[in-house]
Amino acid sequence: MQIFSTRIRFLLINLFLTLTVCCYPQDFEVAPVLVSFDANPGENQTQVLTVRNHSNERQKFVLNLADYTLTMEGTKSVMEAGSTQRSLADWITVNPSFVELNPNESASINLIMTVPRTGFNTRWGMIQVEVAKEQMASEADKQLSTGVIIVPRIVVLVKQSPRSNQNYRGTVTGLREVEGPDPEFRSFEAILTNTGDKILEAKVFLALANLETAEEKQFNPVSVSVYPEQQRKVVLTLPEHPGPGQYALAFLMDYGHRMAIEGAQILLTVE
């Protein structure tokens, strides 16, 4: 499991919020922000999430489950927990889901993954760690009848994929030249499709072969995640100006696990 930590010293405007919130400075930490389970069907696994209050006042933290989907560009969209086919909301328990911490105090949150005997496929979701501020009813926004204001959050991504599931498979199609971010260099777009049932952590890169001299070059890779049943649209830029001639340009995807490198190829003429 890769562990990352995120620390907020001031109020952040979180893109996942759908409501305008009041602005209070916050200072808290959540670690890790990426949690990966590999429980086989019928197994239970537990991992620990740490929430630490770095502010100088007592704060309340709420942990809420949510689903997310991804666009072809890789943008995540937050969905209601349990609303998607790949949701793990029914498999995961967050205990406790509410904590109140003094300054510099931390809490350990148990994330318990209970995989049913039929749970062979990969699933994912998120935990939104939010800070709640209480106000007197007379001071609260009229639309917030509870008198509790939710301020921006830290998002923890959670993934579950059985160890027994080794279905890594993907394709590269639709290679074409497009207008890229830098008009001085030529850019190329391809569609990466995950046709398996594991999240592909892939390296994608361009390779150029001169058809006259047989000279080949590979260029620096870019990291891309492709979820099961997802397509990702990726644009790569050729970082140099090749000399005149005929070339074979390949758009390649290497997702490891002893699988063959996938790719698509087009002919390129440079005058």
Show the residue positions of the predicted features.
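Bacterial N-terminal signal peptides
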Residues: F10-T20
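Beta-sheet-dominated interaction scaffolds and their linkers
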Residues: P25-Q59, P96-F98, R169-E189
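Surface-exposed binding patches on compact interaction domains or structured appendages
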Residues: D27-A31, E57-L111, K203-L206, N210-E216
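Beta-strand-rich interaction surfaces with strong enrichment in secreted/lumenal proteins
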Residues: V35-F37, N95-L101, N220-V226, T237-P239, ...
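Ligand-binding face of N-terminal immunoglobulin V-set domains in extracellular IgSF glycoproteins
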Residues: T46-V48, T93-V129
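Short, acidic/polar linear motifs in exposed loop/turn regions
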Residues: H54-E57, R117, N194-L200, E212, ...
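Terminal connector regions
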Residues: F61-T69, T114-Q160, P242-E271
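Short proline/glycine- and polar residue-rich coil/turn motifs
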Residues: V99-S106, S223-Q231, R258, V270
